[in-house]
Regions:
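Short loop/turn segments that connect beta-strands within beta-propeller blades
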Residues: 66-71, 120-125, 163-167, 215-220, ...
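A short helix->beta-strand "capping" segment at the edge of beta-propeller domains
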Residues: 23-39
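Blade-level signature of beta-propeller repeat domains, shared across WD40, Kelch, NHL, RCC1
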Residues: 284-324
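Beta-rich, blade/repeat-based domains predominating
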Residues: 35-50, 58, 79-104, 128, ...
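Beta-propeller fold detector
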Residues: 29-33, 73-79, 127-131, 169-176, ...
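Short, solvent-exposed loop/turn segments at conserved positions within beta-propeller repeat blades
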Residues: 58-59, 105-114, 154-155, 206-208, ...
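Hydrophobic alpha-helical segments and helix pairs
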Residues: 116-172
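A short loop-to-beta-strand structural motif that recurs across blades of beta-propeller domains
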Residues: 62-64, 115-118, 158-161, 210-212, ...
Length: 324
């Protein structure tokens, strides 16, 4: 997910990224606004089956639940040093899974004592899943129907799988998941946003502008990866979400864009800074009857000289894929 140093390092490069076709799918509106003075910058976002929106807030290091009415409540807090909770997902039972990086921006190191993937129960208690402290940079998560959690390890350039039994292992480690180091952050920024489509894991490689597909084999192992899309217009891609047709939606904070990548690899711009985007990090589809065709956007804005941290709503004309 977007990082302070990453954004600084790639702003200049982002300004030279070729434009993609624009599409006026809907009007961007603010769902809820946060307080930058309180460290409330939304990084990750997820929506449960009841239509509640969950966001990770850094450096406040909280997870906030937003009811369909807009009412907010803190459901979890983390003692992680530096930047804590990042990408998150919610299962059908309302259990939250979140990647906690514990990134110290001064040293550019993560804290092995607190980093990992955490499970947050409805009562607000949380526990680190066994073995995930070995991850170098936990960043985003997705879930399958079997209860497996898949998590990106950004600096290592890998995907981990945590089984329902709690065992964590490196599931996929491939050059296509590795960052190039081009952002100059001190370590590569590779595998980042992650989503599941049927029996395929889709991963965004931030520095290299790639979307990579990893099939889940019948025995549960990772199959050979393939490139779904590759373009300078994808450099900086962060969190991703899919609609019912398999089109991929992504937040690109360094470009102030929300884009859609169609099945043929074509890229369409859905919203820009002119629509109120301010370093958007990631996106998630609504689940309520009136919100299934709405994309909820984490308007991160951590580095903006005029920060406007918020959750935005963007109608996109297609419903999100059903949750596992």
């Amino acid at each position: 997910m977007p990082l302070r140093g990453v954004i600084i390092a790639v702003v200049a490069a982002a300004l030279t990224v070729p434009s993609a076709p624009a599409a006026a799918e809907g009007h961007v509106e603010t769902f809820v606004a946060f307080d930058p003075a309180a460290g409330e910058f939304p990084e990750g976002i997820a929506v449960d089956k009841r239509g509640n929106v969950y966001v990770s807030l850094i450096p406040a290091n909280q997870i906030c639940r937003i009811a369909p009415s807009g009412a907010q409540s803190v459901v979890a807090e983390f003692d992680a040093p530096g930047l804590g909770p990042a990408g998150l997902a919610v299962n059908a039972k309302g259990t939250i899974y979140v990647a906690v990086s514990s990134l110290n921006l001064a040293t550019r190191e993560t804290d092995p004592a607190t980093r990992g993937v955490y499970r947050v129960l409805e009562d607000g208690t949380s526990e680190r899943l066994p073995g995930t402290g070995a991850m170098l940079f936990p960043n985003d998560v997705t879930l399958d129907k079997r209860g497996n959690v898949y998590a990106t390890d950004t600096s290592r350039g890998a995907v981990w799988r945590i089984s329902p039994r709690g065992s964590a292992e490196v599931w996929a480690d491939h050059p296509l998941l590795k960052g190039s180091g081009a952002f100059g952050f001190g370590f590569p920024i590779g595998a980042n946003g992650i989503a599941l489509r049927h029996n395929t894991i889709i991963v965004a490689n931030t520095e290299r502008g790639l979307l990579v597909a990893l099939p889940i084999e019948p025995d549960g192992s990772a199959g050979a990866p393939t490139v779904l899309a590759e373009s300078p217009a994808l450099v900086g891609t962060d969190g991703i979400a899919l609609d019912v047709h398999g089109n991929i939606y992504a937040g690109i904070g360094v470009q102030n864009k929300i884009i859609r990548i169609d099945g043929d690899g074509s890229i369409v711009i859905l919203a820009t800074a002119e629509d109120g985007l301010n370093q958007p990090s990631t996106v998630a589809f609504g689940t309520g009857r009136s919100e299934r065709k709405t994309l909820f956007v984490a308007n991160f804005s951590l580095l903006s000289p005029a920060p406007t941290p918020a959750v935005l709503k963007l109608p996109v004309g297609e419903p999100g894929q059903p949750k596992p």
